[in-house]
Amino acid sequence: MEPLRLLILLFVTELSGAHNTTVFQGVAGQSLQVSCPYDSMKHWGRRKAWCRQLGEKGPCQRVVSTHNLWLLSFLRRWNGSTAITDDTLGGTLTITLRNLQPHDAGLYQCQSLHGSEADTLRKVLVEVLADPLDHRDAGDLWFPGESESFEDAHVEHSISRSLLEGEIPFPPTSILLLLACIFLIKILAASALWAAAWHGQKPGTHPPSELDCGHDPGYQLQTLPGLRDT
């Protein structure tokens, strides 16, 4: 079992060094947030996904993806203990791994989907630490092993933390924009209804006076000629 594990560790180490891989370190039992920045204009209208790399040339098995409707990408979607949310205006894809476990360690990808193809936004190597106070000791790393092997990898400041139950993150830019659009639409609709009601009134028309007694002003009383001579 140990030789097999050593081979896996060496494989992941070489793979992470060959690519521009970012290392995210998390503590077992806590939550880890992974951020993947991207060009919001280039990837406008595209769904995003989080997948796990299977082998050097194997496929990247999808773990979770954003909402099928791109406009709702800001909504958090869960698959087991993994969540994904996309700030399409800010250009940041955020993945949350809740209750981090040793088997969660490994190589992942943030992807931008277009049709049947996918562009890699960032390669991520997740490390699971046994003790946050002793994370520099290689013996406390479940995966992938010694830190000296990641000379070419960029270590992100992403030590995991416990999420409080009452903690509510600030809404992303997409939510604020959606609320602003809804508010603007309501204002425009109210203005249109008010304008239609104002134009519907006919200026200069007055209700009939009580002195008319119901007679048509076009008819007048005339004296008969025979009655005038008598």
From Swiss-Prot:
Effect of T66M: Results in defective protein maturation and trafficking; loss of proteolytic cleavage by ADAM10 and ectodomain shedding; increases protein aggregation; decreases cell membrane localization; decreases phagocytosis; loss of LDL, CLU and APOE binding; greatly decreases LDL and CLU uptake into cells
Residue ranges constituting the Ig-like V-type domain according to the UniProt record: 29-112
Subunit-level organization: Monomer. After ectodomain shedding, the extracellular domain oligomerizes, which is enhanced and stabilized by binding of phosphatidylserine. Interacts with TYROBP/DAP12. Interaction with TYROBP is required for stabilization of the TREM2 C-terminal fragment (TREM2-CTF) which is produced by proteolytic processing. Interacts with PLXNA1 (via TIG domains); the interaction mediates SEMA6D binding and signaling through TYROBP.
Effect upon mutating R47H: Likely risk factor for AD17; no effect on cell membrane localization; no effect on autophagy in microglia; no effect on phagocytosis, including amyloid plaque clearance by microglia; reduces ectodomain shedding caused by proteolytic cleavage by ADAM10, while also reducing the oligomerization of the extracellular domain after shedding; decreases binding to and uptake of LDL and CLU into cells; decreases binding to APOE, phospholipids and oligomeric APP cleavage product beta-amyloid peptide 42
Cytoplasmic topological domain: 196-230
Keyword tags: Alzheimer disease, Amyloidosis, Cell membrane, Disease variant, Disulfide bond, Glycoprotein, Immunoglobulin domain, Lipid-binding, Membrane, Neurodegeneration, Receptor, Secreted, Signal, Transmembrane, Transmembrane helix
Expression across tissues: Expressed in the brain, specifically in microglia and in the fusiform gyrus (at protein level). Expressed on macrophages and dendritic cells but not on granulocytes or monocytes. In the CNS strongest expression seen in the basal ganglia, corpus callosum, medulla oblongata and spinal cord.
Molecular functions (GO terms): amyloid-beta binding; apolipoprotein A-I binding; apolipoprotein binding; beta-catenin binding; high-density lipoprotein particle binding; kinase activator activity; lipid binding; lipopolysaccharide binding
Protein name: Triggering receptor expressed on myeloid cells 2
Post-translational modifications reported in the UniProt record: Undergoes ectodomain shedding through proteolytic cleavage by ADAM10 and ADAM17 to produce a transmembrane segment, the TREM2 C-terminal fragment (TREM2-CTF), which is subsequently cleaved by gamma-secretase.
Source superkingdom: Eukaryota
Positions in the Extracellular compartment: 19-174
InterPro entries the record matches: Ig-like_dom_sf (IPR036179), Ig-like_fold (IPR013783), Ig_V-set (IPR013106), Immune_rcpt_domain (IPR052314)
Cystine connections: C36-C110, C51-C60
Disease field: Polycystic lipomembranous osteodysplasia with sclerosing leukoencephalopathy 2: An autosomal recessive disease characterized by presenile frontal dementia with leukoencephalopathy and basal ganglia calcification. In most cases the disorder first manifests in early adulthood as pain and swelling in ankles and feet, followed by bone fractures. Neurologic symptoms manifest in the fourth decade of life as a frontal lobe syndrome with loss of judgment, euphoria, and disinhibition. Progressive decline in other cognitive domains begins to develop at about the same time.
Binding annotation for a 1,2-diacyl-sn-glycero-3-phospho-L-serine: H67, N68, R77, T88
Residues in the signal sequence: 1-18
Site feature (Cleavage of ectodomain) residues: H157, S158
Record annotation: effect of changing A130S: No effect on protein expression and maturation
UniProt entry tagged with the keyword Transferase: no
GO biological process: amyloid-beta clearance; amyloid-beta clearance by cellular catabolic process; apoptotic cell clearance; astrocyte activation; cellular response to amyloid-beta; cellular response to glucose stimulus; cellular response to hypoxia; cellular response to lipid
Species this chain originates from: Homo sapiens
Cellular component, GO annotation: extracellular region; membrane; plasma membrane; plasma membrane raft; semaphorin receptor complex
Glycan-linked positions: N20, N79
Pfam families: V-set
